[in-house]
């Protein structure tokens, strides 16, 4: 019996799908001679040994399988191949759905360590850099310090640990220091500090073009423009002084007073060499020290070293935290479009000018009597029926009372004023429009002041963070040189030297001034 006849006879009593699966399995694993035994629903499935004539059996199996596929899906169905592909023999094609493909594995970029004798892989450059610093470079306190680079073919030799850790950033694609203004990333804090000078120059030029906005807002506009320009080119407060005085008293929340104070703060030095630039008055006063004190009590080993703009230690960390929280507060206000209003008290609103109903032209009889009374001419009193003397209730004090002392021209002016009583209302409307335009201009000034302060805060925050990172690197270097294991031990030793409890020759603090007793 042929497979097609057997399928047509068994379609009424048995499941056609089970017969199709049996026939597919039979034609792929047996020859044409054993088809009838494999498709019989009553006979058990047998697996005879394959014959040598495999080419003819394969052709007959493929032809019968194609006929069965056409019967199952129709002769013109486009899914005929899909039905054959979904057979148990094609399970290898379903592997991409159940298992990750090679393209998915390629999306995860692994960073391989190329140090001599190491082949570990890491998912991020941060982990690779940490592995290099801890496992391969080591520490002097652990007696495994390696100052020679062994990355691939690199043969760089250094003399300090911070030098080799800084050199490793060349091999590792690590840029952890990002600029808050333009989102550009750098490998070292020194590179970010150099980049911040570009934004500092842009912000300084912007302040010079806009001029002193806090004085304009309070209504204290100065006529001397050169003095206002000098105020912004030579600020009255330095960044160090602002951190000493304002950070400890102010809250890290944006306000109008804080913005006006930061508008006159000297930011980063524009020139690369601070020795050539003239120091400001505030910096000179803050750094003025008696020469006797310097010569007898202090020894500064690094005279050519650039003086930092801010302090060290806890003060620097407090300043970084202040500007970081202030930047977060201003970013939330910027995202919510919620700018705080000025907290300077109620602004005095000028009262609208009251226009008189009649011209301020007093009558002849209302003039003060100095000396002899002037003669009263008859031409002014030809319409009068009674001659009255000037008193407190005359028309000079009560304009609405039309006295007989007014002349013809004054009475005509009174009638014209009564006919034009709606003129002051129009003037009031124009005044309200001018006040509205002033309010809009003040809102624009507040918005510009907010953006300017936000840029300044981000610039100062990045600079202070770089200063803190450099100080931490210097501390680690000194820690390695002196063999300290913790910051507390280092601080206790420094305090002992300053207080004179131990001789200063046992420990040398090159970065800090030494007290000579």
Swiss-Prot record:
Motif segment (YPX[LI] motif 2): 512-515
Residue ranges, annotated region (Disordered): 1-105
SMART domains reported in the protein's UniProt record: ZnF_C2H2 (SM00355)
Biological process annotations from GO: positive regulation of transcription by RNA polymerase II
Pfam families per UniProt: zf-C2H2
Post-translational modification: Activated by C-terminal proteolytic cleavage by signaling protease (probably palB/RIM13) at neutral to alkaline ambient pH.
Motif segment (YPX[LI] motif 1): 355-358
Stretches with biased composition (Basic and acidic residues): 18-35
MF GO annotations: DNA binding; zinc ion binding
Biased composition (Polar residues): 87-102
Gene Ontology cellular component terms for the protein in this record: cytoplasm; nucleus
Low complexity compositional bias, start-end: 40-64
Renumbered zinc finger spans (C2H2-type): 111-136, 147-171, 177-199
Principal location class: cytoplasm
Localisation per UniProt entry: Cytoplasm; Nucleus
Keywords: Activator, Cytoplasm, DNA-binding, Metal-binding, Nucleus, Repeat, Repressor, Transcription, Transcription regulation, Zinc, Zinc-finger
InterPro entries documented for this protein: pacC/RIM101, Znf_C2H2_sf, Znf_C2H2_type
Quaternary organization: Binds to DNA. Interacts with RIM20, which binds to the two YPX[LI] motifs and is required for proteolytic processing.
The family this protein is said to belong to: Belongs to the pacC/RIM101 family.
Function in brief: Transcription factor that mediates regulation of both acid- and alkaline-expressed genes in response to ambient pH. At alkaline ambient pH, activates transcription of alkaline-expressed genes (including RIM101 itself) and represses transcription of acid-expressed genes.
Protein's name in the database: pH-response transcription factor pacC/RIM101
Organism for this UniProt entry: Kluyveromyces lactis (strain ATCC 8585 / CBS 2359 / DSM 70799 / NBRC 1267 / NRRL Y-1140 / WM37)
